[in-house]
Amino acid sequence: PRYCEADPFEGGKQAVAEAWRNVTAVGAKPLAITDNLNFGNPERPEIMGQFVGALRGIADACRVLDFPVVSGNVSLYNETNGRGILPTPSIGGVGLLDDFTKSATLAFKAEGEAILLIGETKGWLGQSIYLRDVCGREEGAPPPVDLAAEKRNGDVVRGMIRAGTATAVHDLSDGGLLVALAEMAMAGNIGAVLDAAPAAIVPHGYWFGEDQARYVVTVRDADLLGVLSKLKAIEVPCVQIGKTGGDAVTIAGEQPVKIEKLRHAFERWLPDYMAGKN
């Protein structure tokens, strides 16, 4: 919703692209979507503008990703005391997995595996969770969605899963790279030792930016050079950012954060929020 409020067109594209990445990240071929379009009063020009912009973005993404809408519904006039809800296009995607034994999960599988970041990272913080929750700011443009890059990168990741070279896969979205890595570490109960952010990108943008069309993939050492060479040959951005191992997530030059501590924060947030402790 925050993306759509700032830029309905890009927000509509992103909603479809994220569903496409979710299906891709398990190794399935994305087939179709259902949409649930929730907006305020369309008799107000600004609300109708949001609705039309989001639909244009959804349509563009569906065409490029070959991910058609096969069902859906629309809910309008959602407002309280004259104030409309945030524009919320909800997208559900379905895909086909030919062989469930060749599917992927986000959990780190073993120590000593290479962690790869696939897709271009610029450190885009506009409308990010980091900007909102850490900095207390809701501003800027959302990250642009390059649909051609989404298609290319996703097809490559799906091929890696089917070939058995990807041992764990997680698509990046809310919270950015470091949040995804923490989720992978918690799921597998295996830590990660990470390289520092590249000098060309500010650290908070690198770790928490929400650039689109990206995945974290782990591969065995025996497959690493082959994977890097193949992706370089087809001009898919890919860089090794660290290795799995240990009982903490550690960035070079920083203090480690134990998986146990991450899990406690993750699992306690909702109960604490409902109890009014946050």
Label for each model-derived stretch:
Residues P1-G123, S128-E139:
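Glycine-rich phosphate/pyrophosphate-binding loop regions near the starts of catalytic domains
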Residues E5-G12, V16, I47-L55, G84, ...:
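Generic structural signal for well-ordered, non-membrane alpha-helical segments
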Residues G12-Q14, G95-D98, P144-G154, L194-I201:
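A general structural motif
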Residues A19-V23, T34, L147-D155, I161, ...:
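Charged, low-complexity, helix-prone segments enriched in Lys/Glu/Asp/Gln
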Residues A54-A61, L65, V70, V74-S90, ...:
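Glycine-/charge-enriched secondary-structure boundary and capping motifs
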Residues L131-V169:
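A glycine- and small/hydrophobic-rich beta-loop-beta segment
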